[in-house]
Amino acid sequence: MIHSLFLINSSGDIFLEKHWKSVVSRSVCDYFFEAQERATEAENVPPVIPTPHHYLLSVYRHKIFFVAVIQTEVPPLFVIEFLHRVVDTFQDYFGVCSEPVIKDNVVVVYEVLEEMLDNGFPLATESNILKELIKPPTILRTVVNTITGSTNVGDQLPTGQLSVVPWRRTGVKYTNNEAYFDVIEEIDAIIDKSGSTITAEIQGVIDACVKLTGMPDLTLSFMNPRLLDDVSFHPCVRFKRWESERILSFIPPDGNFRLLSYHVSAQNLVAIPVYVKHNISFRDSSSLGRFEITVGPKQTMGKTIEGVTVTSQMPKGVLNMSLTPSQGTHTFDPVTKMLSWDVGKINPQKLPSLKGTMSLQAGASKPDENPTINLQFKIQQLAISGLKVNRLDMYGEKYKPFKGIKYMTKAGKFQVRT
């Protein structure tokens, strides 16, 4: 199925390649580079690119393109999901998935890829199993391997492969038994110039860190599970139980894993946590324009909005900007025309604002449309959809584990039109 995998950085350099069947020439990536040049942003490169003799399927994560080469027609989502699994595995092994880290651990990377695919078909994609096959790198293990010439490949068959629960190894033991869950929601929204919501959607995930002895059986229930649409589960979740009772019942993998991802559509009246007041004016036959924006909390349930960053691509006719922020720092690049304002936390009693004038090109006509304002922010201990975990129960073991739930909302593509 998958013949080759190429890892390409944002500069267009191929820094790693892996072939499972026959060697595919790097020249096949020329079709990908052409599509990359046509795309305005890296995220806009088509995920499927047909060529005369191959198909190129790609994902873009952590400023790296993971490009799979196939020669026969296969379901594209199948390959794309596998590529995402490769990225998640690298992140689990090395802590971060970046070009320098992959280069530093290139031997382990090749060993992991060799186990994940067998003759081009996915074989072992569970992190628990892979870590028994290929030991994660440590400083001590790296030094020993360098001296002795050994590898990270394990010398025993993974116990999980022989179990009815392939995602969990047997014989797990911990001194402190704990289960923590993070509910992370990302809100994508477009707000028109009057402040009305054009569209708003929430993409959410529940990430888990489970370190429990033995073979625990967990159930996780929600206060309002009907909010969730398009739910995608980890294989450990019993789907029939979810369909009938809207309860998550599962034997968890050991360690960190993504329990589920979900989507909340605009039909459920997505709450907008921030608002932007703006007054941006360009005058005809004038060399000055007015710029004024204020950011404030809207529906945050009393929680603090942190890490606020405002960016805006100004029109070509703007030569410079003389602005004064009431809070934070700002920069304007006269070459790229990009305005950036690092706000930080929002104090509801003293709303941050950015005011000043714009120097415009002499004789330039008024822009066809005002610039769009892009926001980034995060809110701790809040799931903006209103999703709440009701309780977590454990069966099959007699000890009492430590349990914890954290919530976080952050901005995805959050745009305000002016």
UniProtKB/Swiss-Prot annotation:
InterPro entries for this protein: Adaptor_comp_med_subunit, AP2_Mu_C_sf, AP_mu_sigma_su, Clathrin_mu, Clathrin_mu_CS, Longin-like_dom_sf, MHD
Keyword Membrane on entry: yes
Keyword Glycoprotein: no
MHD domain segment(s): 176-417
Location within or outside the cell: Golgi apparatus; Cytoplasmic vesicle membrane
Keywords carried by this UniProt record: Cytoplasmic vesicle, Golgi apparatus, Membrane, Protein transport, Transport
Gene3D superfamilies in UniProt: 3.30.450.60, Mu homology domain, subdomain B
Any Gene Ontology CC annotation: early endosome
CDD domains with a match to the protein in the record: AP-3_Mu3B_Cterm (cd09261), AP3_Mu_N (cd14837)
GO biological process, one term: clathrin-coated vesicle cargo loading, AP-3-mediated
Topology versus the membrane: Peripheral membrane protein
Subunit-structure text: AP-3 associates with the BLOC-1 complex. Adaptor protein complex 3 (AP-3) is a heterotetramer composed of two large adaptins (delta-type subunit AP3D1 and beta-type subunit AP3B1 or AP3B2), a medium adaptin (mu-type subunit AP3M1 or AP3M2) and a small adaptin (sigma-type subunit APS1 or AP3S2).
Similarity remark: Belongs to the adaptor complexes medium subunit family.
Function: Part of the AP-3 complex, an adaptor-related complex which is not clathrin-associated. The complex is associated with the Golgi region as well as more peripheral structures. It facilitates the budding of vesicles from the Golgi membrane and may be directly involved in trafficking to lysosomes. In concert with the BLOC-1 complex, AP-3 is required to target cargos into vesicles assembled at cell bodies for delivery into neurites and nerve terminals.
PANTHER family xref list: AP COMPLEX SUBUNIT MU
Name of the protein in its database record: AP-3 complex subunit mu-2
